[in-house]
C-alpha cells in the first residue's frame, strides 16, 4: 500500500485562498410592473374589494405616506389578481396559486440579475464554482438554485446552496456564506442571488391584523446578484468591495419580534414587538464587536449599507448612533425607489453606492471612505453584520451594470 506524498495540512493550505473575499460584480433586476406609492391605497382597496372599509383605508394611506417609498415593482398585476380573487381576500386558501407564480418567476427574475452580474464580471460562466440562491418567496424541489443552474447553463458540477424562508436579514447571510466559500476554496467564484416576489405575502386588509398591512405598504419585488471571489485577477476582474468579517446574532429579548408562517393562505407576516426599538437598542453592541478590533469608534467615518426594513428603523438607528443624514443616503434611496425587497435590498444598496460614488467623483466605492458596515435585520430578531472595505475608483470603474 503506497504512502501518501502530502499531509492533510498541506492539502488544506493549498485549498485556501490567500486574500479576502471580494465582490467582483453586481447586477439587479425588477419586474416591469411599477406601482407608485401615492396611488397604491386606492388601488389596493379597490382590487381587494375593501373600499367599504373607509377608516382602515385611511390608516393604510397614512402608512404609505409615512413609508418614505416613492415607488415599488410588483409581479402581481391587476389583471392577474382579478383572475385570482382568493389572493385578494384576507385569509382565503391560495397557496397553490401563489406557488404556481413564484416557482417560475423567482428563478426567472434571479436569472435577469445574474446575467447582468456575469456580464459585468466579464468572465466565462464555466468559471463559476458555487451558487448560493436565497428567497423567502415559495419553496420547491429541486429548488430555484437548480432551476437557475439550468437557465444560465452553469456546469452540472457547480456546488449549490439553496436558502429558503430566511427573511429580511438574509442579504447579509449570503455574503457571509459566500465569504467562507471563496476564502476556503482557492480559485472559487461564487454566484450569489437573492430573488424576492411578494406574491406569497399579498392579501387583503384586516382591522385585526394591522402588522400585515404594514407589509402591504412596504414590500416590493426585486432580485440582486453578486460574484464573490478571493485573490482577483486584476487584469480581467475589477474588485468593488472586500468582505472583511461577518457575524450573525439573535438580539436579546426579541423572540417573536418578526414572524412569518407559510400556510394555505400564503406567507403570513407578524410584527409582535417594537422592532425599531430593539434594533436601535442593540446596534452599538454589534458595531463595537465589529469595529473595535479595527480601532474604529467614529461611525460617521464608515459607509453604511443597512437593510431598510422601514423608515422608523433607519430613523432610530441614526439617532442612536448620531449618524449624519448622508451616511444612509444610498439606503434611503433604495427604500424610496424599490421599497423593502427583503434579502435583495442590501445588494441593491451596494450597487447604488458604488455607482453613485463613481458618478460623484469619490475616491473609493464606499462614498470616498475606506471602511463600511452592512447590516441585515429580520426574523428572530436576527442581525447580520458584515464589515466591508472599499476599493479605490479608477476612471470609468464601478459604474458598469
Curated annotation (Swiss-Prot):
Pfam families xref list: Chal_sti_synt_C, Chal_sti_synt_N
GO molecular function: naringenin-chalcone synthase activity
Keyword set includes Acyltransferase: yes
Keywords, alphabetical: Acyltransferase, Flavonoid biosynthesis, Transferase
EC code: 2.3.1.74
UniProt pathway annotation: Secondary metabolite biosynthesis; flavonoid biosynthesis
Enzyme category, top tier: transferase
Keyword Flavoprotein included in the entry's annotation: no
GO BP terms, alphabetized: flavonoid biosynthetic process
Active site: residue positions: 168
Catalysed reactions, as listed in the record: (E)-4-coumaroyl-CoA + 3 malonyl-CoA + 3 H(+) = 2',4,4',6'-tetrahydroxychalcone + 3 CO2 + 4 CoA
Record InterPro entries: Chalcone/stilbene_synt_C, Chalcone/stilbene_synt_N, Chalcone/stilbene_synthase_AS, Polyketide_synthase_type-III, Thiolase-like
Stated family: Belongs to the thiolase-like superfamily. Chalcone/stilbene synthases family.
PANTHER family with a match to the protein in the record: CHALCONE SYNTHASE (PTHR11877:SF14), HYDROXYMETHYLGLUTARYL-COA SYNTHASE (PTHR11877)
Summary of the function given for this chain in its UniProt record: The primary product of this enzyme is 4,2',4',6'-tetrahydroxychalcone (also termed naringenin-chalcone or chalcone) which can under specific conditions spontaneously isomerize into naringenin.
Name of the featured protein: Chalcone synthase 4
Amino acid at each position: 500500500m503506497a504512502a501518501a506524498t502530502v499531509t492533510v495540512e498541506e492539502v488544506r493550505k493549498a485549498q485556501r485562498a490567500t486574500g479576502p473575499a471580494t465582490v467582483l460584480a453586481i447586477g439587479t433586476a425588477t419586474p416591469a410592473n411599477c406601482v407608485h406609492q401615492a396611488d397604491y391605497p386606492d388601488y389596493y382597496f379597490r382590487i381587494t374589494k375593501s373600499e367599504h372599509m373607509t377608516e382602515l383605508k385611511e390608516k393604510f394611506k397614512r402608512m404609505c405616506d409615512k413609508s418614505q417609498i416613492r415607488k415599488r415593482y410588483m409581479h402581481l398585476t391587476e389583471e392577474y389578481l382579478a383572475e385570482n380573487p382568493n389572493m385578494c381576500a384576507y385569509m382565503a386558501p391560495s397557496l397553490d396559486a401563489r406557488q404556481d407564480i413564484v416557482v417560475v418567476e423567482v428563478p426567472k427574475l434571479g436569472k435577469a440579475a445574474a446575467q447582468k452580474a456575469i456580464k459585468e464580471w466579464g468572465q466565462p460562466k464555466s468559471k463559476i464554482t458555487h451558487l448560493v440562491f436565497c428567497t423567502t418567496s415559495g419553496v420547491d424541489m429541486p429548488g430555484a438554485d437548480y432551476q437557475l443552474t439550468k437557465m444560465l447553463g452553469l456546469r452540472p458540477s457547480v456546488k449549490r446552496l439553496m436558502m429558503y424562508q430566511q427573511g429580511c436579514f438574509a442579504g447579509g447571510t449570503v455574503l457571509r456564506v459566500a465569504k467562507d466559500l471563496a476564502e476556503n476554496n482557492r480559485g472559487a467564484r461564487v454566484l450569489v442571488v437573492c430573488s424576492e416576489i411578494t406574491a406569497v405575502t399579498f392579501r387583503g386588509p384586516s382591522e385585526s391584523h394591522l402588522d400585515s398591512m404594514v407589509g402591504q405598504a412596504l414590500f416590493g419585488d426585486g432580485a440582486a446578484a453578486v460574484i464573490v471571489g478571493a485573490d482577483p485577477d486584476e487584469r480581467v476582474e475589477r474588485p468593488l468591495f472586500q468582505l472583511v468579517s461577518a457575524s450573525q446574532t439573535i438580539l436579546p429579548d426579541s423572540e417573536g419580534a418578526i414572524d412569518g408562517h407559510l400556510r394555505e393562505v400564503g406567507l403570513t407576516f407578524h410584527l409582535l414587538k417594537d422592532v425599531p426599538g430593539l434594533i436601535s437598542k442593540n446596534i452599538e453592541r454589534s458595531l463595537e464587536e465589529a469595529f473595535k478590533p479595527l480601532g474604529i469608534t467614529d461611525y460617521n467615518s464608515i459607509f453604511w449599507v443597512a437593510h431598510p426594513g422601514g423608515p422608523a428603523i433607519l430613523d432610530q438607528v441614526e439617532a442612536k448612533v448620531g449618524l449624519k443624514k448622508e451616511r444612509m443616503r444610498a439606503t434611503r434611496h433604495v427604500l424610496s425607489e424599490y421599497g423593502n425587497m427583503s434579502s435583495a435590498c442590501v445588494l441593491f444598496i451596494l450597487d447604488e453606492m458604488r455607482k453613485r460614488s463613481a458618478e460623484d467623483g469619490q475616491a473609493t466605492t464606499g462614498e470616498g471612505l475606506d471602511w463600511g458596515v452592512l447590516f441585515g435585520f429580520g426574523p428572530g430578531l436576527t442581525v447580520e453584520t458584515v464589515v466591508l472595505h472599499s476599493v479605490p475608483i479608477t476612471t470609468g470603474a464601478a459604474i458598469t451594470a
